[in-house]
Structure formats: structure tokens, C-alpha cells
Amino acid sequence: MLPRRGCAIIGNVTSSIAAEFRRYKSLGEAAIAQVNEADLAKVAGEDNSIAVIVWHIGGNLRSRFTDFLTADGEKPWRNRDEEFEARVVTREELLAKWESGWQALFGALASLTDADLDRNVTIRGRPLAVSDALLRSLAHTSYHVGQIVYLAKEGAGGGWTSLSIPKGQSAAFNQNPQGQKPGEHVARLERK
């Protein structure tokens, strides 16, 4: 459960969680934008490609957050195993799948209040507090966005544009910190 002071939740938790999700969405999109379309499906050995990871995130978010409070988060129409099959799709198809998941997530988050955090949802037949489901999804999503960034950076080689504080520039950043809050970070990524 999330921190409480008396009976009140500290701060507007749902807004903070939504801001963190927006930050990871922007981070993933900024990484994907640096990858040639042909390289989106590139794999090394048994690893997943960027395309597979993006497809999985889109499917996971859409399943979890469609009818979030009223239906099991593992929808009968979702085929999780299929999400991990190698695929060659256009950038537009890939981003459409990605966006469908994020739209479901942000739609669900927009309808929540902090009071809803104490409610339960069901995922794979098991009850889970809304707050726990949101934090679990945020951790899951950030894990996979990290994979996307790593693969994109690896594929870009010397042509990579840093999405955070560039190597060797921490002191300069600390003199004029930008992007410390999720909304600021999103705005900075969108300017690149």
C-alpha cells in the first residue's frame, strides 16, 4: 500500500503515477525514434527485438487497463505468447499497437481518484489492490522501456543522442537541473 498520513493519502498519487507513466512512454518513443525501421525487428540470439518488446507493452497495457476496475486484467482476447513471436512490422503498425496500450492506460488513470487506490481489481483471477496493480504495471513497463533504450542505444552506435544526462556532463547538469520532475523530463525529451 501507499504511504498514508492518518486516513489521507499523501499527495495526489494517481497524478504522480500518470506522470511517471508519461515519462516512460516518452523515453521509449525517443529511443524508438533513433532506430531505423529495419532494425526494430533485429535480434541477437534468443533476445527479444524492440518490435517484440513494444508489441508486448502495447498488449499488456491494453489488457490490464481496458475496463480496469470491472474486468480481469488478463483479458480472454489477449494472446500473450503471440506478443513474443518475432515480427517484422512497419514503424506505423508498431506505434499503433504501442499507442493502443497507452490510451487504455491513460483512459483508466484519468477516471481514477486516490480513493480508488484502496479498491481491488482482479488480475489472472487474483484480487490485487489498485495501488499495487498500478505500481506493478509501472515497474513492468519501466523494465521493458529500459530494454528498448538499451537495444536502441546499442543499435545506434555513435549516432545515439542521450535521453538523460550525457556522460561527463553531470556537473553541468547539477548547476542547472532540468527534467527532475516527470513532466519536465517529458517536455525535454519532446524537444529533442
Language model segments and positions:
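Basic polycationic patches enriched in arginine
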Residues: 4-5
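N-terminal leader segment of winged-helix/HTH proteins
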Residues: 14-15
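Short, contiguous alpha-helical
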Residues: 18-22, 26-32, 37-83, 123-192
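Helix-adjacent hinge/juxtasegments
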Residues: 67, 72-108
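A short N-terminal helical cap/helix-turn-helix that marks the beginning
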Residues: 110-113
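Active-site-proximal loop and beta-strand segments within enzyme catalytic domains
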Residues: 119
